[in-house]
From Swiss-Prot:
Family affiliation: Belongs to the universal ribosomal protein uS12 family.
Keywords for this protein: Methylation, Ribonucleoprotein, Ribosomal protein, RNA-binding, rRNA-binding, tRNA-binding
Biological function: With S4 and S5 plays an important role in translational accuracy. Interacts with and stabilizes bases of the 16S rRNA that are involved in tRNA selection in the A site and with the mRNA backbone. Located at the interface of the 30S and 50S subunits, it traverses the body of the 30S subunit contacting proteins on the other side and probably holding the rRNA structure together. The combined cluster of proteins S8, S12 and S17 appears to hold together the shoulder and platform of the 30S subunit.
SUPFAM superfamilies named in the record: Nucleic acid-binding proteins
Any one of the GO CC terms: small ribosomal subunit
Lineage: Bacteria, Bacillati, Cyanobacteriota, Cyanophyceae, Oscillatoriophycideae
Known partners and oligomeric status: Part of the 30S ribosomal subunit. Contacts proteins S8 and S17. May interact with IF1 in the 30S initiation complex.
Source organism: Trichodesmium erythraeum (strain IMS101)
Protein name (Swiss-Prot/TrEMBL): Small ribosomal subunit protein uS12
Length: 124
């Protein structure tokens, strides 16, 4: 425990909160180019083939981003937009690809939560 004199000499430092998405560099979204599109398996109690992409961002980072929704049209050299948001059962995946922007198509035949998957309103 510091003495009063030590506290006068140098005040206590506030610990700065570390960001959970450093590659975004304080921006809400970032553009990037897919360098690899592949599937990976989740952590222990879950079982699936999750679709992910390795993305080289305009901020210079290369990150792994999750591709949400059923079916996608992404391949190498596709230009995508990413946002923050981790996938709990995929270690190291801290970003989501935004569906329906740039080269990423929206989810086909989506009726609910359409805005999250870039799907247009179906014709009545």
């Amino acid at each position: 425990m510091p003495t009063i004199q030590q506290l006068i000499r140098s005040a206590r430092q506030d610990t700065e909160k570390q960001t959970k998405s450093p590659a975004l560099k304080s921006c809400p979204q970032r553009r990037g180019v897919c360098t690899r599109v592949y599937t990976t398996t989740p952590k222990k109690p879950n079982s699936a083939l999750r679709k992910v992409a390795r993305v080289r961002l305009t901020s210079g980072f290369e990150v792994t981003a999750y591709i949400p929704g059923i079916g996608h049209n992404l391949q190498e050299h596709s230009v995508v937009m990413i946002r923050g948001g981790r996938v709990k059962d995929l270690p190291g995946v801290r970003y989501h690809i935004i569906r329906g922007t740039l080269d990423t198509a929206g989810v086909k035949d989506r009726k609910q939560s359409r805005s999250k998957y870039g799907a247009k309103k179906p014709k009545a």
